[in-house]
Amino acid sequence: GLQGSNDNFDLERLEVLGDSFIKYAVAEYLFLKYPLEHEGTLSQQRSRFISNKTLYSLGKLKNIPEKIQSIILNPKINGILPGFVLKPEIELHLQNIKAPSDTWARYANVTEEQFKEEIKKMEDGGRKSCYNPWTQHEVSDKSVADSVEALIGISLLVGGRETAMNFLGNLGMEIYNGTSFQCSLPVPSALLSKEEWANEEVLRYYDKYCLDRLEEKIQYTFRDKSFIVQATTHSSFCQNKVTDCYQRLEFLGDAILDYLVTGMVFSSHVHCTPGQMSDLRSYYVKNETLARAAVKKNLQCHLLYLAPKLQASIDKFISLFQNGLDDDDEIFTEDDAVDLEDVEVPKALGDLIEAIIGAVYLDSGKSLQRAWDVVQVLMGDIIEETMKKKDIPMNCVRKLYEMVPTGIRFDKLPFQEDDGKAMYKLEIPGLPPLIRSGKNYDVAKIVAAKAGLRLLKEKEERGF
């Protein structure tokens, strides 16, 4: 049932759960199916698998739109009398003249000329949907895709991962051909060479960079040390010739973390609205939160990189963190920093945690329980602190609209070709216009929203 059906329940919470599962299932499949593809290609392929267009097409083939409850079930408004049938010639005539569905019931009460005149007026107002209101309903493509995700979510709840995978197979999604997770593709080694020297080199890196201490911090001992070496190797660390960098593991770990966190939020916040669930999930998996978790466990000292700019960014973030950075402080990432006063959150720290989660998952034989144990070790205190808070953290753009419900306006400005920056203009009632830039328009909008929140906070502190 859609939210518009005004029933006691709807699909939206299940949709959030199903969305995270399909993202995880497809990410694992692509990671194992294409061991030589880099993270960018895998992300593009995953987007094709899980897009609303794909889910809509699969749902339509299975006649799911016919099963959706999209309107209020009210006999006085849309009920049909027993034995009532619209004559085929009347239905064909109404369709030919493109009569909007909410006018069909009045056809017998007016003359043909009056009815056509009424239709013309409604068309001028943009009302053009024409269908039989007693035997058909109007459902958007996205609603069909959302329903498919909700069905995946309920399959997961009722029967677990295997049932959800079987449902994906029955839908026609080409991952594992509908077979079991346990019978899926083998896990490849992280080593780039099968020669004996490669194993020796991995152990040398393991000892040289004290990765045994990292294992102690995450409370997991790797059986295949090549996974932990890969998980800690930044793309700038060209000295490592035996494994790839962590980007592929980060792609997998991101999906696993999203799935595990969504499941935790779904089960522990039963009274949360779908919007609040999404806010919580976004808060737990965003780069700021992961960077805080990494610094709390001092994981940055195990990151292998050769990038002075990244070193400066990490040092600056650690300094701020040690000086008592508050969780509510607005922080800018490397991608959206606009001046020296903005605090940079090194994306590599969040990527490191995601790569470690992906590495643990593979090394443990694709055990979600082991991966969740590591998540709890790294982020358990952050999750516990958030649960104690009265207010649920939310996206900065949404938070801005919550604080100022009316009058806010975001305007895109022309792309700056000279420095490759996208720009957004933000207007808030009672404040001067703000112009902020970023590497793309999505980032620029977030930067502008964060700047607006800071101004509102300063205004409130001054008592205006």
Regions found by a protein language model. Give the residues of each.
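Double-stranded RNA-binding/processing signature
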Residues: 1-464
